[in-house]
């Protein structure tokens, strides 16, 4: 047993792979629909960690990265690395790919690679692309809450604890924009990174992050000509999170009228109507750059906003 004083006297060490996103010895999941860019996102993350560079404005701790691919071969991965302008060396990036005659990679067969990566190279980040391409000895149903929550994720957590690295699992979203086995995965991993592309817009990707250890995160991203993810210009203006929620809503609605009281209540914003009104008025030009045009009209005793979304040409 420990007293509260003993607990407070113990040194607190918070190690991270990516600050505010991924802690050391954690298990995380990146999910998205096909063609959104899960593998590109993961390779960009790997490059940032391998070289100690910021990732989407977040600090990283430098570490070698092991990339386990169950879908792409080395040629395909090299094409993406070169297109994105990523810079890896023989000492900071390692690839384990699925053999041509294999249907899935057996997790037990990866033990020697994982051990070598952790002990001989000091690696702290393992990316598994994709979760469904990994075979466990007893088999499992990806849609089974019990299999995922009581067997699959605990297996990866066991490896994380044993070798002292963080694991990022890449997984699919289904047609309803929830991950296969989602409830169990959400409750079992340390954090979920979700990428979604709105059906009405091709240039913007929305990142949502939920975690046990860090604050939630909502970002609007775009991909540049080299396929690298960047924070949208709108985000670089320190945009209030409530305005991001409003923009996401506006993209879906396209044309609508509202008052600040109505929209604050409808979207359950964590802000007062008067505060949201001030933020909205201060960002009219920024919103217009993103394709959202807003006009104001005075009707009776209320100020009414008329919003129209037009997809940006760029």
Write out the residue ranges for each language-model feature.
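The Walker A/P-loop phosphate-binding site
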Residues: 1-87, 119, 169
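Conserved inter-motif catalytic segment of the P-loop NTP-binding fold
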Residues: 5, 17-18, 60-147, 151, ...
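Phosphate-binding/switch region of NTP-binding enzymes
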Residues: 29-30, 35, 40, 146-229, ...
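Helical mechanochemical/support elements of P-loop NTPase systems and associated helical scaffolds
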Residues: 73, 77, 106, 110, ...
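Short helix-capping segments at alpha-helix termini
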Residues: 85-90, 162-163, 287
